[in-house]
From Swiss-Prot:
Pfam families: Gemini_C4. Belongs to the geminiviridae protein AC4/C4 family. It comes from Mungbean yellow mosaic virus (strain Vigna) (MYMV). Keywords: Host-virus interaction, Inhibition of host innate immune response by virus, Suppressor of RNA silencing, Viral immunoevasion. Pathogenicity determinant. May act as a suppressor of RNA-mediated gene silencing, also known as post-transcriptional gene silencing (PTGS), a mechanism of plant viral defense that limits the accumulation of viral RNAs. Transmembrane segments: none annotated. GO terms for biological process: symbiont-mediated suppression of host innate immune response. The keyword Iron-sulfur does not apply. Disulfide bonds: none annotated. This is Protein AC4.
């Protein structure tokens, strides 16, 4: 699928062993050389962290229309990941936004 055709993003969040899930998706048609930011968050496993942290990957890039979606995603996935403190240490109801 070519980048100028469609970008579709799906995300989900679940809390503990709860069966309730919040799902979201968005679809848009990017323009050539359109600048976009991709942010992803994932919870680290207990043995990977000393305190409550989120793994955050934030990428700002100009999508290249000539590359396939798979190539674009592979490039984003290869970028380094940084650790950030989880804000819910103060407020347990806080959930970081992916937008």
């Amino acid at each position: 699928m070519k980048m100028e055709n469609l970008i579709s993003m799906f995300c989900f969040s679940s809390k503990g062993s709860s069966k309730r899930r919040t799902k979201g998706s968005s679809t848009w048609f990017p323009q050539p050389d359109q600048h976009i930011t991709i942010r992803t968050f994932r919870r680290l496993k207990a043995h990977q962290m000393l305190s409550h942290t989120w793994t955050k990957t934030e990428t700002s890039l100009t999508m290249e229309v000539s590359k396939s979606m798979a190539d674009q995603l592979e490039e984003v996935n290869s970028l380094p990941t940084t650790l950030m403190p989880r804000h819910s240490i103060v407020d347990p109801s806080y959930r970081p936004s992916i937008y």
